[in-house]
Amino acid sequence: MKKLTQTMKWLTGSAVLVSMLALGACGEQQQQAAAPQEEQAEQAQQEVIVWKLAQTWGTGFPIFGDAVIKMADLVKAMSGGQMEIRIDSANKHKAALGILDMVKAGQYEMGHSASYYWKGKDPNTMFFSTMPFGMIAPEQYAWFYYGGGMDLMKKVYDKQGVYSFPGGNTGNQMGGWFAKEINTLEDLQGLKMRIPGFAGEVLSQLGVVVTNIAPGELYTALERGTIDALEWVGPSLDLNMGFQKIAPYYYTGWHEPATELQFMVNKEAFDGLPPHLQEILTVAMEFAAYDMYARSYHDSAVNWASIEQEYPEVRIRTFPPEIIAAMKEANRELLEESAAADPMFKEILDSQTAYMKMARKWTEISDYAYLKDNLE
């Protein structure tokens, strides 16, 4: 009996030992099998995804170009270096107004520009920059992110094979620099002016000869008399361009109350990113866009003071009521005509009009009422 008990203990111990050895061997096999998978995952994390971005702006262009750099820096930092975006300026790619085409074709994964530059390809893109007598920046951002604007922008750009995202706002722009004073509608007849977007179509109705010129060529065109007037941005950037040296009349705005730039992303390239990098890129673009708006406001305020102090020869003017009324009427007629011809145009116009009607009531009772009562 004692011997049987000893035998049973030996068998039990052996069984446990065999089981432990078997489990150990199995665990080792699982570890060996898992190792390549972990190595592959780690390798994927270490792979650096390098994209190229083409921008309309020249090398070192302030504010607009700075927003692109900020976005790229954020993507690299938030991804832990897994994704990098290399920026080509217009000085390199030589196609300042061809950004959409290059991103669509896959020459660049990303672009940064203003969507009204290709209104000739699709007039609906103008809505995502700005429209004359339209929303101001806070209203427009609210429309983009909470009022259906992003969905409408996606519908328009889907057929281009491109995703579009807000890329920075200039705020309310000035009406432009003029070689001569504008007092009547007759003064607009035959006037050669650089002004893009729907505003250019409005002024064409009033007799202005409208042209679109790349940013890097504006100063020379105005200085040489190729054009008589130009609209660029506002004090934040206009003083850097030197327009105050060659055109004495600086008019307040009507045409671009909230000009939004765009980040464009090749759809196939974006869809091919891992989800976490898609999210990082989206967040970086949104942050850079609103940061540019704050920077534009700051620089405009600082440079406006410089105009008053350093350039007393610059004469600030507002277009006479007669001209503003004619602009509004031409704008209304063109909008109605385009909406009747294009259902997509009408859908976006109806959306913006309804949202502005709602939001403007709050703007009037909040910002406008406060400013009206507190302006010195």
Go through each PLM region and give its residues.
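Bacterial N-terminal signal peptides that target proteins for export
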Residues: 2-14
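C-terminal motif of bacterial Sec signal peptides marking the signal peptidase cleavage site
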Residues: 22-25
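N-terminal secretory/targeting leader peptides
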Residues: 27-140, 152, 157-159, 163-376
